[in-house]
């Protein structure tokens, strides 16, 4: 969200996006996360978007479920029957299609599911839908009394390099523009076998448009 802009833009980077690692070898974007310091992921974002990353925040599954439950659930439209069992990780996704309010565990299944033709690209769209619904729920005045509960979740499960002032500044800017001025999009690109290959020209145009506050 550039200074002076009335729009907050969230860009999703698909997990299978090709990016050069520290050794110059092209790898999946998600390989920069597991077992590596945040700097590796921040550098990966810079490589695929051209944007420097000043701060980072890591929200784990427990934090995600806690936030959703603290908000009383999240309203989404489940677009298809979703059923998946992972014996190794010991979790089950079991959702039926239609408009509904999901609790934390169900919402986590919704944003993790990718057993369909478009795989992670379809999952990204569901994650964006859920984020927008969460943003709308979060600004409900009734939740002002749950600030302490939210902060307990942050203290217990969220890892970041931000201070309290920066949290407050981001929150105030988000409240100022409101969720109706949030927009979500996926890193422009195309499938290249099992990978997502960023379209450098389209990415460049998108980033410049965001910086200038223009139409996308």
Q: For the regions a protein language model found, what residue spans apply to each?
A:
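Non-catalytic, solvent-exposed segments at the cell envelope interface
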Residues: 1-216
């Amino acid at each position: 969200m550039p200074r002076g802009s009335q729009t907050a833009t969230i860009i999703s980077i698909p997990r299978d996006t090709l990016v050069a690692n520290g050794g110059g070898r092209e790898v999946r974007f998600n390989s920069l996360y597991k077992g590596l310091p945040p700097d590796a992921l921040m550098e990966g974002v810079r490589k695929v978007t051209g944007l420097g990353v000043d701060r980072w925040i890591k929200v784990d599954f427990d934090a995600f479920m806690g936030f959703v439950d603290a908000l009383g659930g999240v309203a989404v439209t489940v677009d298809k029957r979703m059923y998946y069992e992972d014996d190794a990780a010991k979790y089950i996704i079991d959702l039926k299609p239609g408009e509904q309010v999901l609790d934390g565990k169900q919402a986590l299944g919704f944003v993790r599911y990718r057993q369909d033709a478009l795989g992670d690209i379809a999952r990204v769209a569901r994650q964006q839908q859920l984020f927008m619904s969460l943003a709308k729920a979060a600004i409900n005045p009734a939740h002002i009394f749950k600030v302490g509960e939210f902060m307990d979740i942050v203290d217990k499960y969220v890892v970041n390099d931000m201070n309290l002032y920066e949290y407050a500044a981001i929150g105030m800017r988000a409240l100022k523009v409101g969720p109706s001025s949030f927009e979500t999009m996926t890193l422009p690109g195309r499938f290249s076998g099992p990978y997502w290959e960023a379209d450098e020209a389209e990415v460049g145009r998108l980033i410049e448009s965001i910086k200038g506050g223009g139409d996308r």
